[in-house]
Regions:
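Generic recognition of stable, solvent-exposed alpha-helical segments in well-folded globular domains
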Residues: 42, 61-68, 72, 90, ...
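Generic non-transmembrane alpha-helical segments
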Residues: 72, 76-80, 126-138, 173-181
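Short beta-strand
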Residues: 85-90, 142-147
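Conserved PLP-binding catalytic core of the aspartate aminotransferase-like
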Residues: 86-134
């Protein structure tokens, strides 16, 4: 479409490692960092259109649903007997967590910066492998990004169709694939 495709990255790339992981499957096909839509420039238009379409009450209901699903996800992680650990605490629609192999449970530290290098390295390599397996088998799609040098899962709970059963299935798949690695 353009004479010099490299100019797209030069103009729009923010280099956000939390969005565009080089170690994910099919990274070479991810055009996100080469598009106008990736930058924050367009977000205000998307927000305005969504608000106009749903109105105040509809927009509030969407946010309440997203928060409820995120809270449910955090509750499932907390009740997982150490299979999952929350990496970033807080009350918002993003849930950042790690899967922990049985031999490392319970973790001596919950923050990546406090883990010993060997454990952090072991945990770092798991999310890309688990995500690739989920993609290959079509069981789910979840992002991951580094937090203090360790890849972690990042669940963004914004879809109005997302239900607690979807969260259960996703966490069960992560646990299953992690145990099979």
């Amino acid at each position: 479409l353009i004479k010099r495709p490299e100019q797209l990255a030069a103009c729009f790339a923010g280099g956000a490692d939390y969005l565009f992981q080089p170690d994910k499957q099919f990274a070479e096909f991810d055009s996100g960092d080469r598009t106008f839509q990736c930058a924050r420039r367009i977000d205000v238009l998307k927000l305005w259109v969504a608000w106009k379409a749903h109105g105040d009450a509809g927009f509030a209901a969407r946010i309440d649903h997203a928060m409820a699903i995120a809270d449910y996800t955090r509750q499932r992680i907390a009740a997982s007997d150490g299979a999952f650990v929350s990496i970033v605490s807080g009350s918002f629609t993003n849930v950042v967590f790690a899967w922990v192999p049985p031999e490392l449970r319970p973790l001596a530290a919950l923050h990546p910066a406090d883990l010993d290098d060997q454990v952090r390295t072991q945990l770092h390599h798991l999310p890309p492998q688990i995500k690739a397996r989920m993609q290959a088998e079509g069981t789910g799609m979840i992002g991951f990004q580094p937090v203090h040098g360790m890849n972690t899962f990042r669940m963004i709970c914004m879809s109005t169709t997302l239900q607690t059963t979807d969260i259960d299935a996703l966490l069960d798949a992560i646990d299953q694939y992690g145990n099979e690695i």
